């Protein structure tokens, strides 16, 4: 009953699926007889009549012929029905009168279609019966297996009881054995303890003896040190007692201000002096006046008036600024001698404040200095320095040996009155052998050279006789060093004696010389440590500490930078949907197979509406998940099948405060929107820092890995909050573990499974044998040998064993016709390729389109290679779906039967083509067919390659024999045809075990080698002898009869003629057939081919307008040009046309011819070759536009549209040879480093930029595709429409690409120029190359370019800026900074062409450095370097056909010309300012100084610079000379302007002026832009375009003089009047339109 129930459910689901298919737009199309245009006609009729009973009756027919929009004929059995719609709303169906309205040909086609449908139904019934039989057999086998399992369970119980008894016996014996072992172990342990205790006691005795000896030595050393310090202390305190402390304190100086002298007497004055000492301790608060304090820094003298002002209130006056004589003179000069007498008697002590604590400290320091000076004087007077030096030298000797050596030399130094310290230094430094020489030098200083020579001889001989081995060389080297040191010491000694250096000077001289000699070399010595494993490591003593400090600082900086930089986050817009409930609308997202949202969004609703794009479905609310501490919950909705394309979001691995992204919709729910910012996790609450909108409730918060963290609940006032749901979702959706006992033993469980498998193995094999017999029966039903081979392919190999891509592989060796459905379900991408496309940002729809395009291409290649007619393949999709549905269960049963078997079978994971290497050998002749297929693991790939080389010989196959040998590994793919194959060398490779051989009836001989983790190497071999009428297989037990007695042989490919045009030349066979095959035309109502053309003219039935083709008529109707519109049908997808070899990117290498002589190239440019091209060389005629007759020309004679001759091509090469640059990287290394840092700092927003997939890059598709593609296509859009993206993908993935060179196409720019430039043939050159090369550059740079466009308000580069709406004003005011600046305008001449190669390469490497680390793979690095190399070293094709090479400059037609020029401009400007700064100040400026004192804006080579006055003086002549001699770049003097204000300077063609409101606005070059009204560069299409051009000019000239605006207003008025007369509608422009834009 359960089986019947499941069958019923299956048929019920089948009926539901069939109903859904009938509701689809294409349902019923497979029944329609095909002719050209039938798809569009069918869709229009279905839309018009799809809901009428007549149309329903028509769709029930087996075959349908659509005669026209109102008439159709349907066949069901032998009845021919007629569908006729006299009115759109009332069509009729007549079931028996249709045969009278069709021709015999049409009737034959309908009969064929009807017969095909009936055959399909009969086949389905037959197949269904076979499916039912297989399922019944399978069910019986399962029942038998269950019975066997029950028996096995009973046996297991008996075995388990025996095992339990056996275990008890073993446990008892084990316990006794363990008891004996414990006793033995305890005994051994006690013995070991006694041995260890004895050894420890011995070691302690030795250690105590060593310590005792060390203490004795330490006491002796301490005694000597104590004696020395006692002597020093006695001397120091004795000398201090000699000092007179009273003389060190100067007497206080106290003055009384005027007005208080009469109240003071001498007694009081003495009291004040006493108070002065108290004043120093801040105890006496004076009432009024000044206190004179002693200072130690000279200050400005105080004037009399300043003194009176200070002393009118409590204040302090420094002693150095108080000069009584000067003050008295000033007073007498101002007030007279009489008044001034007695005014400056003395100062009264006043207030002592906290600010004068420093004064007390300075006084204490001064007193200390005086004490020290006095002590030092006493020391020198009594020659105590000699005593102190001697005592210190003896105390610091360190050991007795040095003490006894120095004592006599100190006595000698005292006796001869020579420096004691220098003598002690010599005794300590030089070896013992040199002591006699030192003594001799003291007594006889005039023989220094002889003495040094004798010392050197003595030390060298001593080293030779006293040392051994390599130490001799070291000692000899030391001898030389000691000798040099001895000479220096002798000179120092002579200087000391002559100059009578004091002790302090001797010590200072020695320390300075020692530090200069040693430096920091020994402190920073690198130590090499060799580890036991053979590795070495180097450590630096000081460097290690330095590195630790640097690393800690870097960590702090990185943390601060990370906190302020928003990381890149994957877009999750494909994972959200709109959720509509009864009370509101919110956002939902997919998690697993559910849609989650906030509960309040669907509150009160059991059913919610989910929307995603154009899909809108209903879904049921399954449950809610409560969230701790939250008033809201998470609602869980069922995922409808229609939303399976919505991508699920994975849970976050770690939840912490970080930058999170909220993915939601805009307020109108039209487009997805993302909000990124810093979010704080507070328990379960999530607080964000960005503004959200109403309707964002339920949106997911994702981390920078795109994983789910929380859900948005809403906005509470100014605070937007969400809730963390990671733990809640883990607890809710976590799968429950299977319950098992605590003492569960997995090994024991596996043993039971193995035992059960052995018991039931025979029964399973019996069932398998029965299934094999049924398979053999199905094989015998095959009516042709081709069907047999197809059946052999299906049943002989389980699906999924190997996964290959169709691109570039050879098809099966037999000549059998495959259907289109076979190709449309093939795997076109490996897992690796598919994952790479996902990581590069391709959506599911884009990947699906790319795969379908590859499938279409594979099908077309198959049809052309095998001369297969693809007629009738329009219904491939329905046939494929129906076949898959019928054969699904048969495939599953056959796969189970054909799996590898063993005693214990564990199904292994299927290995894909990427994961498992494979060798496939096929050799077929008329009498014999041999195949061998070997699949091995990755670790056996090398053995497989060697076996392949042994099997494939160098001998060619004889006539009538064909062979193919294929090898596929992870890194190599080989295909060899036409060579004799030695099948005896094809043997299996053992993994880690024996090779098991099996004979599977009806298939092949199979050898299996199984290793650990069920890894297997499988060899399948087959040897078939072909006789008349039979196929005999050696390894098969039963012969298989085949009705088709054709021999199986592979025909060698040979030239064939096209059956449509008769040509044997290679061409587009599909297009040829499409043009010449006759089809029924719905417009002509007759059979004809596209080559013959339509019989009657094609015209619109509404406006009677004629067209040359049906496509143009359809475009006319759909575009709405006429009032009557047809219903637009679906856009038909066209399979891409294979790209001919002569149009591919590197095809120019085959087209180039030897040089034929120069036509346009100058002498200094080398001619490489010649390629004939049919392009315009000279332009002598100007464009004539009749529409410009409506306007009056602007009067000017300066500008004109360009014309040129061949001379212009010669002239344009001058910019590449203006002047050669120097090696500025080596000569100006510090400047280069500074410039690099400034460029990195200026463009740091480009960091961690991403690579854009080549199919997602954006560029102008209407531009020329360059050579060789412009030979067939005028634009890239046309090329993509025909050929698709395949060549783009092949070039990027092909490793040989970096070994090829693209070709640049050169042409002159048609623009408005000065007439003298036109007369001088000075026309700008444009370079462009193949769009594939351009898009490779866009892969690396599109993200960076877009980021630069977003930074124009705060950065220098102005790509994407606008001068309107105050844009120019804001940028000019940014240049002002904090004022006090001057402005510099500079424009290079031929900027692009003169950029040094090394500078351009440097900027390009900086751009690669800004890429995210995940993109900096070796492959991407090689591809990027190849791209940059071809930007620098360009191979150029001229319209004259000449091919040359240029190795300088930035090509103007590359993807990032302006962005690169901006970065180079920043680099050069930094160098320019630093060069002037260095010249004027003798040092380089710092980065901070440059940022604070210089600002700039630039667009390509256009630059406006502001410099703070006093920072650097701008010297134009120096700048011009610098650019020429260092970089080889051209700057003219008249292109440099320096002003204090920006008014009058220009930027991007706009002269800066101030408007009446005080804002900075721009005025264009009026004569240049208005000259196009007389001499245009291209014609305008219509009057509307002319009006738009005039309005645009009027916007630009809003700030120009009034006569210019008046002129343009008149021209606009004239055009508007003309348009009104001709009934042409033009937009209205308001009165303040132009001014508001600025």
UniProtKB/Swiss-Prot annotation:
Its EC number is 3.4.21.-, 2.7.7.48. GO terms for molecular function: ATP binding; RNA binding; RNA-directed RNA polymerase activity; serine-type peptidase activity. It catalyses: RNA(n) + a ribonucleoside 5'-triphosphate = RNA(n+1) + diphosphate. GO terms for cellular component: host cell membrane; membrane. Keywords: ATP-binding, Coiled coil, Covalent protein-RNA linkage, Host membrane, Hydrolase, Membrane, Nucleotide-binding, Nucleotidyltransferase, Phosphoprotein, Protease, RNA-directed RNA polymerase, Serine protease, Transferase, Transmembrane, Transmembrane helix, Viral RNA replication. InterPro entries: Astro_VPg (IPR045836), DNA/RNA_pol_sf (IPR043502), Peptidase_S1_PA (IPR009003), Peptidase_S1_PA_chymotrypsin (IPR043504), Rev_trsase/Diguanyl_cyclase (IPR043128), RNA-dir_pol_C (IPR001205), RNA-dir_pol_PSvirus (IPR007094). The record marks 170-171, 552-553, 797-798, 916-917, 1051-1052 as: Cleavage. It comes from the Viruses. This is Non-structural polyprotein 1AB. It comes from Turkey astrovirus 2 (TAstV-2). The gene is ORF1.
